[in-house]
Amino acid sequence: MIKNSFISFQEKKKENSGSVEFQVFSFTNKIRRLTSHLELHRKDYLSQRGLRKILGKRQRLLSYLSKKNRVRYKELINQLDIRESKKISFLN
């Protein structure tokens, strides 16, 4: 799975739990878990709200990373197989 390969990649860096990449990675895992949960439980509105909050946090971290280091941002997007936001793509 993506998680194991990315964690082994991140373990090479000693500051993995606080780095932007690791935070985005953990938010992405939470988003995927919540998405599969919501496919079964469509009326779970609290989980929907939690998903929206996590999506916003991940989006803010990704926009921060794209402003600070565009190369690391592109690598992270490709590794996690997530789409680039339209807002971020217009910034650069």
UniProtKB/Swiss-Prot annotation:
It is found in: Plastid, Chloroplast. Keywords: Chloroplast, Plastid, Ribonucleoprotein, Ribosomal protein. InterPro entries: Ribosomal_uS15, Ribosomal_uS15_bac-type, uS15_NS1_RNA-bd_sf. GO terms for molecular function: structural constituent of ribosome. GO terms for cellular component: chloroplast; ribonucleoprotein complex; ribosome. GO terms for biological process: translation. Part of the 30S ribosomal subunit. HAMAP family: Ribosomal_uS15_B (MF_01343_B). Belongs to the universal ribosomal protein uS15 family. This is Small ribosomal subunit protein uS15c. It comes from Carica papaya.
